[in-house]
Amino acid sequence: MSAQLTSRLRGYVQVTKPGIIMGNLISVAGGFLLAAQGNVDLTLMFATMIGLSLVVASGCAVNNCIDRDIDAKMQRTRNRVTVTGEISVQAVLSFGIGLGIIGFAMLAIFTNSLAVLFAAIGYVVYVGVYSLYMKRNSVYGTLVGSFSGAVPPVVGYCAVTGQMDMGAVILLLMFSLWQMPHSYAIAIFRFDDYAAANIPVLPVAQGMTKAKLHIVLYIAVFAVVSALLPLAGYTGIAFMAVTFATSLWWLAMALKGYRRDINLQSWARQVFGFSIITITALSVTMALDFQVVAQTPLLTLVP
């Protein structure tokens, strides 16, 4: 295989943002296994994970096309293939659309209408609402984007149940809330990039003081909402213990941002890093510490 072909293939992989796909795989598996309550259909599980991964990859590829102008202004993203021209925008867009078609087809064939609906809503919000408009024009872009980031575990959950019940609602709220301090931490340690691209994330638009306050508040509310899973009977004492330990540590870490001698860049990286540990730990624990509970539907669609 020639070096040129290898580089091109690497470029196609990079536009799908493998790190984001991996994180979503963990969360969709967590939601799926929580809902399965020990009765795991492996074919359905892997079809859901692969299908949703392709949908996420599609959204990321299309996002690369949309963001190429602002990516050119940011140190972290200026070498993306859609910026350098190593791969044409048309090729990346076609690649992304193709991934999306295959991903949605897999979800439609193997899962159910509700799982497909949530995947579609998440896709439209991320690509159509967040990437095309909110990210560039509003300080609330992060809030809107948090919904699409919370969709994967809900898709995994609904792929099993075929209904929207309280467990799915808690997952949606929990993962949406987690996205906020996670994203604000990135915006702080990448402050110069966002400012250069004129992206109105909270630290840039309204200052570090407000950003630090929001990080603390969102972590606190995230902890409370996460505790609803065991309190509602969906998980057991192990999940409650992990929720308490990780959330308390994350909150204590966030509060250190108010120290006068703190290096904000280093602090934000720590908050970001521990956010990954927190959500991974909770996703794994919910998959293992599920409880058998009656799943009362709030919304059901015909499969």
Curated annotation (Swiss-Prot):
Q: What is its EC number?
A: 2.5.1.141
Q: What is this protein called?
A: Protoheme IX farnesyltransferase 1
Query: Where does the protein end up?
Result: Cell inner membrane
User: Mind telling me which PANTHER family this protein's record contains?
Assistant: PROTOHEME IX FARNESYLTRANSFERASE, MITOCHONDRIAL (PTHR43448:SF2)
Which example biological process does GO assign this protein?
Answer: heme O biosynthetic process
Q: Which HAMAP family match?
A: CyoE_CtaB
- Matching InterPro entries, A to Z? Protohaem_IX_farnesylTrfase, UbiA_prenyltransferase, UbiA_prenylTrfase_CS, UbiA_sf
Membrane-crossing residue ranges in chain numbering: 18-38, 42-62, 91-111, 114-134, 139-159, 169-189, 213-233, 235-255, 274-294
Per UniProt, the keywords (alphabetical) are: Cell inner membrane, Cell membrane, Heme biosynthesis, Membrane, Transferase, Transmembrane, Transmembrane helix
This protein's major location comes to membrane
Q: Which domain of life is it from?
A: Bacteria
| GO MF terms held by the record | protoheme IX farnesyltransferase activity
Known catalysed reaction(s)? heme b + (2E,6E)-farnesyl diphosphate + H2O = Fe(II)-heme o + diphosphate
